Structure formats: structure tokens, C-alpha cells
Amino acid sequence: MPYLNSVPFFRGLPLAERYELTDCVPRELGVKAAAGEVVAGPLPLADYLRLESTFERLGPFGIAVRGRARSALLFSRKPVRQLDGATIAVTEQSSTTACLLRLLLEQRYELKSLQYRRGQPDEADALLLIGDEALQAHHTNTCYPFEIDVAFEWWLWQHLPFVFAVWGIRRDADADVKKEVEVGVIKALAMNTPRFAAIAEDYAKRLALPEAELQIYLSSFVYRLSQSEEEAIERFKALANEHHLL
């Protein structure tokens, strides 16, 4: 995934010489995984849950946050509780966060008659952005006076972390491939975790954002999921299934 919060898994990944790495946004990754075009990767949680018959978890690895994500943001022209009947624009990149947004708006806030549109239509009442695009929009947005961090809203609602992605690998992959990929991910994560400052410095130039802000951003993510993240996965799965979002 071409996002800063995925860099700890992929920078210097020792698998690059043997395997082809595909760089795609979460929604596209889910489509490719469903089509059999992906062997392993940090699958968007919603897509992994849809594909559990084909994919299994790869170690305890994933992308989660306990509180604010800073890169899963709903920008709105009015306060969230006043969005009844609103048109909500949803980035083409999102899979799991789009599902989370619906749970928040329709179940937490009990909003009615919402219309969701993919893309970024100018007439939308609110706009969901994720990843680096959301990080940048936090600084550049001039159209939407209200901003909501949807991962933080989940935290306030469910008192649990939010898991954006879990590492999955095809169940029919050879055992040696599964082991090799897992070891590669372990090595990349071990190498990059102490280097968040250097990664932030690099991306500050690419994204034209403050280096200190990006270092804090990277440090806020959980890449080895614990029991609280596993509980969050089960809660999200139950709610998404209950409301027919998977």
C-alpha cells in the first residue's frame, strides 16, 4: 500500500528479490486478493473478513491504532449530528474505513437517508479521505469546517482499538512460502521500527508536511496486534455482519 503507515512493513523487505511487490491502495488490494492476484499482504480488514475461506492470518501483524489515526478523516460542512439526509463522498481508495464510516453514521449517530458516493463530488456534504491524502488534507482543506477522526470515534464508541488491516496469506500457499513471507515481515518491521525518525524525515519532503508530526503519526500505530486488537476485530466483524456491510 502506498501510504506512510505501511512503510514499516515494506522498506527493505527482503522478499523483493524473489517476489513481485504490487503497490495498490486498500480497495484495489482487496479486489486483487479476491481475484486471486495476491498471495500475501496487509489486507484491509473488511476484505480479509470477506475472504477468510481463501486467506489465513500471517502472524500477529496488522495496522491498528488506539485512539486517533490522523489519516482516516471525515471532512464535513456541518457537525456530524446534523448530517441527516446528507451526501457523503467516499474516497475510491477505501474499503475498511468506508465500512467503519457507515457504522458510525448509521449506528452510533443514527443518521437517516444518507447517500454515499464514491469519489470527491464538489456538491458533497462530507468527504471521507484516508492515508497520505487525509494527512495532507488536514492542512490544506478549506471547504469543510468540521473534521472527524473516524478511528477515534470508534474508540469513543466501542472503547477498543481500530484495526485497518491484517496481514493475510493464501491458505493454499506452500508452507515454505508462508514461513518465508512471515520471516521477511518480521525482519522488515524489526529494521524499520527504530528508524521512524528517518522515515518521517524522508516523507516530510514527499508530502510537504512537518517531520515531527509524521514521526508522532508513525509512532501511534500498532503493527503487532495484541488481545485488544483481536477483540476489536471480532467486534467490527459482528457489527459489520449484523448490518450487512460485509
Q: Residue locations for each model-derived region?
A:
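A short beta-strand-loop structural module common to alpha/beta enzyme folds
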Residues: 19-29
